[in-house]
């Protein structure tokens, strides 16, 4: 692992980041948009370095959080971050593929799922020669359809799925969610500056 260092998330919480696996404003916005209610059972699909579960556990009162990550380095960072903050009893970090989520969560029992997925479809934009960076930016190992299917498979009836994406993918996201029985209920558009076009959307579906 290269360039590992700790970044503060809150006065009593920090996360281990690297060049390949870090967090940004989108991550923070999604964590708070998808704020868990008291005693909810939650999952973060493709947790990266574990920022969203750490923020959930620090700021809210969920019953339990499952954090799923496919990449070896990101998984290791998330695991170390959970341990560093003393959250082992509250957050379970699992190395796994969300396309095979039923191997991890066999039944639809969870209250809340969140995902900060790759923003670009395969073939859109420039490719990154670094495989880890490429997987984080393009839908190489996880498509919008994979994300929606995973949400459907883990959420109980009435459970909430929260996602962030680029505005140009909004119609795709709504259509895919509906095809998996997840009806969009809440939408927030994010602008970087006043009088500029939105750069991000946050979507909740049930």
PLM features: what roles do these ranges have?
Residues 9, 36, 87, 178-181:
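Short, structurally constrained coil/turn elements
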Residues 30, 116, 147, 205:
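Residue-level signal for inorganic ion chemistry
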Residues 199-206:
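Core SAM-dependent methyltransferase catalytic element
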Residues 1-37:
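Class I SAM-dependent transferase core
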Residues 14, 64, 90-92, 183-186:
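Conserved beta-strand segments of alpha/beta enzyme cores
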Residues 117-146:
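Mobile active-site "lid"/loop adjacent to the S-adenosyl-L-methionine
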């Amino acid at each position: 692992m290269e360039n590992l260092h700790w970044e503060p998330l809150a006065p009593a919480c920090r996360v281990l980041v690297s060049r390949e696996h870090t967090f940004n404003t989108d991550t923070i916005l999604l964590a708070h948009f998808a704020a868990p209610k008291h005693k909810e059972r939650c999952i973060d699909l493709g947790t990266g370095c574990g920022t969203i579960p750490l923020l959930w556990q620090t700021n809210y009162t969920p019953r339990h959080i499952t954090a799923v990550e496919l990449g070896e380095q990101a998984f290791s960072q998330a695991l170390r971050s959970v341990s560093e903050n003393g959250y082992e009893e509250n957050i379970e970090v699992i190395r796994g593929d969300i396309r095979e989520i039923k191997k991890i969560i066999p039944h639809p029992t969870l209250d809340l799922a969140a995902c900060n997925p790759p923003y670009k479809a395969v073939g859109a934009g420039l490719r990154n020669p670094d495989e880890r960076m490429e997987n984080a930016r393009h839908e190489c190992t996880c498509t919008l359809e994979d994300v929606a299917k995973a949400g459907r498979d883990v959420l109980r009836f009435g459970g909430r799925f929260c996602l962030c994406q680029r505005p140009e993918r909004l119609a795709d996201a709504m259509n895919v969610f509906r095809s998996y029985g997840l009806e969009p209920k809440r939408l927030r558009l994010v602008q970087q500056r006043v009088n500029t076009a939105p750069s991000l959307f946050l979507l909740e579906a049930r």
